[in-house]
């Protein structure tokens, strides 16, 4: 299953 991309800190 593909998990939604988490907002990574830039």
UniProtKB/Swiss-Prot annotation:
Keyword presence, Heme: no
Cellular-component GO terms for this entry: extracellular region
Molecular-function GO terms, alphabetical: toxin activity
Keywords, alphabetical: Neurotoxin, Secreted, Toxin
Subcellular location: Secreted
Tissue expression per record: Expressed by the venom gland.
Primary site of residence: secreted
Signal peptide boundaries: none
Similarity-based family: Belongs to the scolopendra toxin 8 family.
Designated name of the protein: Scolopendra 8013.07 Da toxin
Originating species: Scolopendra angulata
């Amino acid at each position: 299953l593909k998990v939604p991309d988490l907002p990574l800190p830039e």
